[in-house]
Swiss-Prot record:
Annotated protein name in UniProt: Pantothenate synthetase
UniProt-listed Enzyme Commission number(s): 6.3.2.1
Binding site for beta-alanine: 61
Lineage: Bacteria, Pseudomonadati, Thermodesulfobacteriota, Desulfuromonadia, Desulfuromonadales
GO MF terms held by the record: ATP binding; pantoate-beta-alanine ligase activity
Enzyme class: ligase
Matching CDD domains: PanC
Source species: Pelobacter propionicus (strain DSM 2379 / NBRC 103807 / OttBd1)
Amino acid sequence: MNIIAGINEMQTTARSLKQQGKSIAFVPTMGFLHEGHASLLREGRARGDILVLSLFVNPIQFGRNEDLDRYPRDLERDLGVAADCGVDIVFTPSATEMYPEEFQTSISVSRVSQPLCGASRPGHFDGVATVVTKLFNIVMPDIALFGRKDYQQLAVIRRMVADLSQGVTIVGMPIVRESDGLAMSSRNAYLAPPERQSALALSRSIAAVRNAYAAGERSVEALSRMARDIISQEALLKIDYLEFRNEATLQPISEAAGDTLFALAVNVGTTRLIDNTVLGVCRA
């Protein structure tokens, strides 16, 4: 397994691999890997000749008073996960390598970035789109894999790749959950035991909405009320948003259908957690 920190070395390596006719599968992450990341890596291993993992906590997607400084990091552990999953190259650039002092460019994907997380984290998806574009230019992947837990991020990246003709196949992978239903997230490490117990209300609300939809309920108002009632039973939880949207456009809807995204974000103490489901899709 090759570990590369410099942009020039990574680009030179990628060009050489392309000249050899090798396909590159890419999994961009901020590190502190868990089983959700591992599932992306295993799929990437199956789909590409060369598997590249990036570990980079991207400062420009964090807002003021967010958790950039305390975001969990464990390079040694991450390298162990990477080796176990058959990664060929780990790209570990520094912030100054990615964003030198003269850096000025930003990528913005307008409409799909505005609702949901975009409404409460202004500028976040500009930071995501910018770093992903730069990573694509450096790694030169044929395929890139992302988890569906960050559903809006996936939608932003799909739109960006299509609009800019970036030529990368984007694969969205199912949410991976703990045995008790909590969606895996690097930020789960922040949760104290009582907070983690309260956070299970997110997956309970998703299960309740899916069951009601399967039983014939189509009213978004009724489904929203049901989910909010479940979340509100937990005093430690504060809803940021709880919404039903078209899965492709993220536009609001009034009647649920098979292409309806149910997405929610909840603050648990100082930790922000997100979860989602598409109602017409069988859960993994």
